[in-house]
A protein has these predicted regions:
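Hydrophobic ligand-binding cavity/cleft-lining segments
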Residues: 1-36
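Alpha-helical scaffold segments that form or flank carboxylate-/histidine-based iron centers
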Residues: 13, 46-50, 112
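A short, polar/proline- and glycine-enriched secondary-structure boundary/capping micro-motif
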Residues: 29, 78-82, 106-112
Length: 143
């Protein structure tokens, strides 16, 4: 398997960054404006990107430090993929390690997803640091 990995820092408390990952109203500010579902382990989340939907299960949740989504159903080939967010402190910043597991090759789908995750993770950083993200479907979203 060939994972997508991103490592970056956010100048916000770790608890606030984690809350932005699990609170659906905050997810809708940085990821996609249409998010439905729960926020505890075993719950499902439905993310809408225009006509495209992505349904994930919260496979693992360790409060404040780790969140894992497992892709259940999607209009892109990510069923069974795992999306892992790991947080810790690094000085006065929150370090975020993101991993998307599930690709067998670095094809166009992999490249597109890698680019998209970079964009959304920067939106997460902007939301946590400045209070405004660039979620898909929001006025701030850049195509």
């Amino acid at each position: 398997m060939i994972p997508i990995k991103h490592l970056f820092h956010i100048s916000s408390p770790q608890e606030e960054v984690f809350d932005a990952l699990v609170n659906t109203s905050k997810l809708s500010a940085w990821y996609t404006s249409k998010v439905e579902g729960g926020n505890t382990q075993g719950d499902q989340l439905t993310f809408s990107f225009g006509e495209m939907k992505f349904i994930a299960e919260i496979e693992e949740l360790i409060q404040g430090t780790k969140l894992v989504w497992k892709g259940l159903q999607a209009d892109v080939p990510v069923e069974g993929h795992r999306f892992i967010f790991e947080l810790d402190r690094n000085g006065d910043k929150t370090r975020v390690r993101f991993t998307h597991e599930g690709y067998d090759e670095q094809d166009d789908s992999y490249a597109n997803m890698n680019y998209s995750w970079g964009k959304y993770l920067e939106s997460l950083r902007q939301f946590c640091q400045k209070g405004k993200g660039e979620a898909f479907g929001s006025p701030a979203y850049r195509i």
